[in-house]
Amino acid sequence: MPSSPPPSRPGPSARLIELDGLRGLAAAVVVIHHCLLTVPTFARVGAWPGVVPADPAARILTQTPLHLLWAGHEAVLIFFVLSGTALVYPVARRHAQGRRFDWVDYAPRRIVRLWLPAAASTALAVTLMVLVPRSADALLGPWMTQAHPAGLSARHLLLELALQPRYAYRNTVLWSLHAEAVFSFLLPLVVLVVALAARTRAWWLPAAACLAVPAVTGDTRTLVYVPVFVLGATAGWRWGHLDAIAPERPAPWATPAALACLVLVTIGWWPGLQGPVAGRLAAAVSLAAVAALVVLAVRAGALRALLRSRAVQYLGALSFSLYLVHEPVIVAIRLLTASWSPWLVAPLAVAVTAPLTWLFHRYVEAPSHRLSRRAGRWVSSRVRRAAR
């Protein structure tokens, strides 16, 4: 009787292209979010539940699932789950193949990958501040005046370049890169936790613990969003040990389930769900919906035609550059058109941001990515030589 073949190991790491599609769509939502914040009515609503606009149309866009169209903070939660998955997935693939992950290569690579584009986006924001001075005119709304004060203190600029969140006001999106940096430094510890959980066949336990955090605190910002990243890390470790990750054909129920998750992402904004108990439950449900959306897209093929479409994939490829350049442009356009209707900001912002995003990707992000790989290889080779 022939012996059974040895269990196969996962092959080379395949890119999870659904993640790119989700990242691109999330970046587009953030752009819409910031465009709407130039409208004083929506600026008073802000990024977190609590303020109910008096205008009926604004209330519909705020307190119904239509809020998904400009759910900026929830879109960033998707970014964080995707980052956790993307960073842990290659580590898991190497582990499944019996190969070591080069942490010495990872550290400088990650530093260059994050900090160079962030520094370039800060330089862009400062340049636009000099060319288009910021204003304290209350008619512009609280987002334009309070989140974008004037001033170019060298001390604050240095702190901002270090990705300290309190000083990232020249380009407000940099607060999220502070969270990315924190998680990047904690990645070895996170990998250890999810790996130990998986070894005891309780791979789901870190995810369950992370979902419990907003249920207790009522806030997904707890611990610099590390629990949100860990949700993605748990999925990345699990998927990295599978032979087949994405199904050949989408499950028939996958897209309806994903659409239900998209609706639930906005649950924290629905009427009557801002109280102490209801708010905690809504925060947990919203985060669970974000995580489930990512799982459904990858493992069940939800929204596959959309996420794999050429336009959405292209948007995903440029999403980091779009994220880093759009906000200073929107602020500058609103200042230049202060006497115009703020509703004109969106089309003007798209017209200016689209080519600027391409240029930033071509001359900043892509070279930074290549440099990060060279830096990682160089440091790793030097450390190996010194260890001999």
Where in the sequence are the language-model features?
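Cytosolic juxtamembrane regulatory segments of multi-pass membrane proteins
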Residues: L324, S381-R388
